[in-house]
């Protein structure tokens, strides 16, 4: 015992505890890495999950595919997420599993064909059906008398590959019946509200022939509701995967139901179809990679006593929220509230406090659905409750040169969904301590369109993102955008003072709105509920309001003459309502834009009156996340289908780049550890070889690949099932042509049918999915070096895969199994009595050796990994015999344990002066030789049945 820790001055007994019973840290169990699509969750980075329930919580349910419907609004559920089923197969038997969810990314040097995202086939508006295309918007305007100011709204957007879309009906100020675009055309019925106004649309194909005539409205309960009567499935535009009978040339994208419902009441309404584009950019082009959603900047209260000069843009920016990962799920499903805003009360601590609450987007203020809560936050950079420290501010960016993620930020992320970006002055402690979050910048939107009253040339102002000239398809307008004409080429005798608005988020205007138990429960800021009687129901058009803008426009910065912030919300614009209390507070409040500058708000009554807003109980507001993008081609059922990858490179295909980057992300063994790797459903030979080469370079993982030539999934083309089955000979010849010779890869054949245990749907999955499950089953019930095949460990009918396997896409004959196994492809056999079984365990190594079997390769991976961990703890010790003995004292017992569990027949470890010579000692090297005799599995059984005569004896 050391006496240095004690201070001896006067006599006494000194006691200390020394705990030598602590257990050494154990290494985590290794599982597979699975790369592919998932419903939601972290994207383009490896994430570990330890159970299937954790997988569902993080990445959502596996998707069986086959679901059509409103894909634009509800998301793509039309193709299976094979990676999710592979993760399920493993996690049902074992754990953990590392998942890389794929989204669309692009090579920094990609050419136009290699850009991520999607676009319509023709992106520009023209007057010819064969070349016309892009985004076309329907604007709806209430009827009004001449020269009356009237406001209309963008109500819907259609996206056309070619052909055209236009209205049919009676034009304004005339009884003439016309069909066309760029002209105000009256509704076809007698509406009782803006939503019930009906319009007739005609849709032409590329030849100019009318293919669809549709009457629709915006009443959600009507059979003519716009989202019920138009195609909302973008994949139907894809001729490569859709049969001729099912093909469409357009789809309905955004609809803004609440904006239509809030139009002023009128006896009639007019619609006009205009192209959404300008001289440079097109509304039908979204060709860019995945990006994260983010909020607008949150800014402070006004600390001055000069309300007349108040401008929210002059307030101090404090922070904003950014999704941890790219994609659209966060913005469609989450919103953020700032609540419990409190002024400082302690003279020793001049900083106020507030809480951040991440809520479900579909909740309402009367019933919060809280996902995460971070309480008692402040803006003091030296505090443990500093906002960035409480939530986290770290993020990663992919370095395409070094092929790695670079990490930025100061504080680990505590939130599963967002990080904080602090204003630099706030982060440096250079702002007043009294500052608190009081408002936020609204999302970026296109500028509204104004037309001048009384002009005979009612053309649009510069920078407007609409077009209605003579050269857009079926235009009835002339002279720019003179769409107020009563008919073509005849100028109108009267004009409207007209504004066309691009929709924006509705804001809470009164604390008494909604079904709240108290006005103090109201969160000002954005409102994600419907208006009217259904006020507590989610407003589905919210999903369209949070979407990213087309290529060429920023979602965070204004573009002069084209886009601007929709609003600047601030609690400084709350006006008191009701009788003021003796404590100078208000029982209710209204949000009135510019009320502080007009000196009618609560906070405009004097210095520090912003505190009255908080004391009155209105210190909370809600802001959205916007602008996230998946970077995928929404016209694909399977955005990474193999038929898109043929003869492609990272520069010519975003799908190829995304898949390759997903593999590159897990190439470094110091970044992520795993023992198996798979990209389920991927049959592209070059990418599969890259996966195998990655595992071989690491030396610690086996790649499970799916082969070209077998079954092709329904999302690959528009062929019938019988034409997509594939065959054994093609699969073998395609593999042999590549000359693959590696013990770090394995392949199986054919695809199998499984039952989704959540939805009870039947689907076909690639063989790598069940192969992964079988390996987990073998590892759980025996050891990883036992052959993952045969009826004991590979019986798929008996549940060995972790999934319920019901069928194979092709029943293999004995000869076909022989041919597959001779080509190092492991057959999945189906027997009448025994059921479906994995009937082989070869690697893709052609050279005969013990390593041409999966159980031996997995044994070697395991042994190398464990002994390398032991060796790592020996580094920087003295290179002497005592150290060698210590190393042997750990390795030999470990190998004896493997031998005792039937992994090795025998072994020998040599570490002495014959291996670590004086020369190696001088070079700081310890060198050991480890000899292994792997235990082989029985794959062939020979039995001779000898028939003897009745007089033979068996004594010998």
Predicted regions: what they are:
Residues 309-333:
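Extended, Lys/Arg-enriched charged tracts that mediate electrostatic binding to polyanionic substrates
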Residues 374-386:
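Short, flexible N-terminal segments of the mature chain
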Residues 364-372:
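Surface-exposed loop/edge segments in extracytoplasmic proteins
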Residues 338-341:
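Prion-like, low-complexity intrinsically disordered regions in eukaryotic regulatory proteins, enriched
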Residues 1-311, 329, 344-353, 359-365, ...:
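Structured, hydrophobic secondary-structure cores that serve as assembly/anchoring elements
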Residues 49, 371-376:
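Conserved aromatic
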């Amino acid at each position: 015992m050391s006496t240095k820790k004690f201070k001896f001055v006067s006599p006494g007994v000194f006691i200390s505890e020394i705990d030598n019973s602590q257990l050494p840290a154990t290494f985590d169990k290794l599982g597979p890495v699975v790369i592919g699509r998932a419903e939601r969750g972290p994207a383009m980075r490896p994430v570990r999950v330890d159970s299937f329930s954790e997988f569902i919580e993080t990445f959502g349910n596996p998707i069986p595919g086959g679901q059509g419907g409103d894909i634009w609004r509800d998301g793509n559920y039309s193709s299976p997420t094979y990676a999710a089923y592979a993760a399920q197969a493993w996690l049902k038997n074992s754990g953990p599993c590392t998942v890389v969810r794929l989204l669309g990314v692009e090579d920094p040097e990609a050419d136009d064909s290699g850009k991520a995202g999607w676009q319509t086939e023709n992106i520009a508006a023209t007057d010819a059906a064969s070349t016309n295309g892009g985004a076309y918007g329907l604007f709806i305007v209430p009827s009004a008398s001449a020269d009356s100011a009237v406001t209309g709204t963008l109500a819907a957007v259609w996206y056309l590959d070619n052909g055209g879309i236009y209205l049919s009906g009676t034009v304004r100020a005339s009884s003439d019946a016309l069909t066309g675009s760029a002209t105000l055309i009256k509704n076809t019925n007698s509406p009782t509200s803006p939503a019930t106004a009906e319009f007739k649309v005609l849709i032409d194909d590329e030849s100019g022939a009318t293919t669809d005539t549709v009457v629709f409205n915006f009443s959600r309960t009507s059979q003519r509701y716009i989202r019920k009567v138009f195609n909302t499935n973008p994949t139907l535009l894809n001729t490569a995967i859709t049969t001729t009978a099912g093909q469409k040339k357009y789809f309905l994208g955004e609809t803004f139901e609440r904006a239509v419902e809030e139009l002023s009441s009128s006896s009639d309404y007019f619609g006009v179809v205009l192209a959404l584009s300008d001289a440079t950019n097109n509304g039908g082009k979204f060709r860019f990679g995945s990006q994260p959603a983010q909020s607008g900047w949150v800014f402070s209260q006004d600390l001055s006593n000069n309300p007349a000069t108040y401008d929210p843009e002059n307030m101090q920016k404090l922070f904003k929220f950014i999704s941890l990962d790219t994609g659209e799920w966060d913005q469609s499903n989450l919103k953020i509230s700032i609540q419990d805003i409190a002024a400082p009360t302690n003279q020793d601590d001049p900083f106020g406090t507030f809480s951040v609450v991440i809520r479900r987007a579909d909740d309402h203020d009367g019933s919060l659905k809280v996902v995460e809560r971070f309480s008692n936050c402040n803006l003091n950079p030296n505090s443990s409750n500093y906002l960035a420290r409480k939530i986290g501010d770290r993020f990663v960016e992919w370095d395409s040169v070094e092929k790695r993620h670079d990490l930025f930020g100061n504080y680990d992320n505590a939130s599963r969904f967002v990080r904080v970006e602090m204003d630099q002055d706030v982060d440096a402690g250079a702002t007043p301590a009294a500052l608190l979050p009081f408002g936020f910048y609204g999302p970026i939107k296109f500028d509204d369109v104004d037309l001048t009253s009384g002009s005979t040339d009612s053309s649009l102002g510069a920078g407007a993102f609409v077009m209605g000239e003579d050269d857009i398809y079926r235009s009835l307008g002339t002279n720019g955008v003179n769409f107020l004409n009563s008919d073509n080429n005849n100028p109108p005798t009267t004009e409207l003072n007209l504004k066309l608005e691009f929709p924006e988020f509705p804001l809470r205007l009164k604390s008494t709105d909604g079904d709240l138990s108290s006005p103090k429960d109201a969160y000002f800021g954005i409102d994600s509920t419907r208006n009217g009687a259904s006020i507590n129901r989610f407003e589905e058009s919210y999903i369209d309001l949070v979407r990213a803008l087309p290529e060429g426009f920023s979602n965070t910065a204004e573009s002069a003459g084209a886009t601007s912030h929709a609003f600047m919300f601030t609690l400084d614009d709350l006006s008191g309502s009701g009788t003021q209390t003796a404590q100078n507070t208000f029982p209710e409040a209204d949000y009135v834009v510019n009320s502080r500058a007009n000196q009618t708000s609560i906070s405009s009554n004097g210095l520090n009156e912003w505190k009255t807003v908080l004391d009155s109980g209105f210190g909370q507001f809600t802001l959205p996340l916007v602008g996230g993008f998946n970077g995928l081609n929404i016209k694909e059922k399977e955005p990474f289908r193999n038929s898109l990858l043929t003869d492609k490179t990272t520069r010519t295909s975003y799908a190829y780049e995304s898949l390759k980057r997903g593999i590159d992300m897990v190439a470094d063994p110091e970044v992520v550890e795993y023992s198996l790797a798979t990209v389920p459903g991927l049959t592209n030979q070059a990418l599969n070889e890259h996966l195998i080469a990655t595992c071989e370079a690491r030396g610690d993982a086996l790649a499970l690949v799916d082969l070209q030539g077998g079954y092709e999934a329904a999302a690959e083309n528009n062929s019938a099932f019988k034409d997509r089955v594939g065959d054994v000979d093609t699969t073998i010849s395609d593999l042999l042509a590549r000359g693959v010779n590696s013990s770090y890869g394995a392949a199986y054949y054919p695809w199998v049918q499984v039952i989704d245990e959540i939805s009870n749907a039947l689907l076909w999955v690639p063989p790598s999915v069940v192969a992964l499950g079988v390996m987990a089953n073998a590892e759980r019930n025996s050891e990883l070096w036992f052959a993952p095949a045969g009826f004991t460990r590979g019986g798929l009918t008996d549940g060995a895969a972790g999934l319920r396997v019901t069928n194979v896409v092709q029943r293999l004959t004995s000869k076909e199994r022989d041919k597959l196994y001779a080509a190092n492809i492991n057959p999945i056999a189906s027997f009448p009595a025994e059921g479906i079984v994995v009937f082989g365990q070869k690697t893709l190594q052609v050279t005969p050796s013990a390593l041409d079997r999966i159980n031996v390769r997995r044994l070697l991976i395991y042994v190398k990994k464990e002994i390398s961990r032991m060796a790592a703890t020996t580094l920087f010790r003295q290179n002497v015999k005592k150290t060698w003995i210590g190393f042997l004292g750990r390795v030999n017992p470990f190998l004896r344990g493997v031998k005792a569990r039937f992994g090795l027949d025998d072994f020998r470890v040599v570490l002495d002066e014959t291996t670590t010579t004086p020369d190696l000692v001088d070079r700081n090297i310890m060198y050991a030789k480890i000899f292994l005799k792997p235990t082989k599995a029985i794959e062939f059984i020979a039995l001779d049945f000898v028939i003897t005569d009745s007089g033979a004896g068996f004594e010998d």
